[in-house]
Amino acid sequence: MYPKAKATRVCSDAARINDLPDDLLATVLSFVPTKDAVATSILSKRWRPIWKRAVNLESDCVELCAICALDCFSFILMRSSKLRVLRFKQKRCCCNLLREKWKQPDFVPLSLYRSLEAFEWIGFKGREKTEKKAAFHILRNACNLKTMAITTSNTFQENTNILIDFDRMCTNCRISIKP
């Protein structure tokens, strides 16, 4: 398909990027959208932690795959001090597996505590040990959260139960569940 010289050039360009020190790669990732910086973690084992060292993941809105986000939740919030909108999309992605259990962070990042105003979870399934625990953590700790919107394919009864559980957690946040 491609001439041999073209393929060689692509490989040499990739090799040049991989020759850069991690600190420089982290600095470069500071200038790309948070979603793209996190996505670099699938490139190789070496790249997995690099995005976490990015100096400035400043964004007021972050949209991530829910499965990946559960793994790096604390790091995203820690590095995004002005985060106002957090959006999870439930989909199969780079990691291609479902989490069976979510580990709650040991601390509450300031962005979650102070600045998060809106949270949206598209494709929420309501799994007890993962999604519900993560959503409860956000509701419990996001003091300025005004809206939580959940889109789900669950039955009406399941959605009603989820809404009742979430309503108990928060009095000052508007929670909506859409099928």
Curated annotation (Swiss-Prot):
InterPro entries registered for this protein in UniProt: F-box-like_dom_sf, F-box_AtFBL13-like, F-box_dom, FBD, FBL13/AtMIF1-like
Domain F-box: 14-60
Positions of the FBD domain: 101-152
Alphabetized Pfam families for the sequence: F-box, FBD
Residues forming coiled coils: none
UniProt name for this protein: Putative FBD-associated F-box protein At3g12840
Organism whose genome encodes this protein: Arabidopsis thaliana
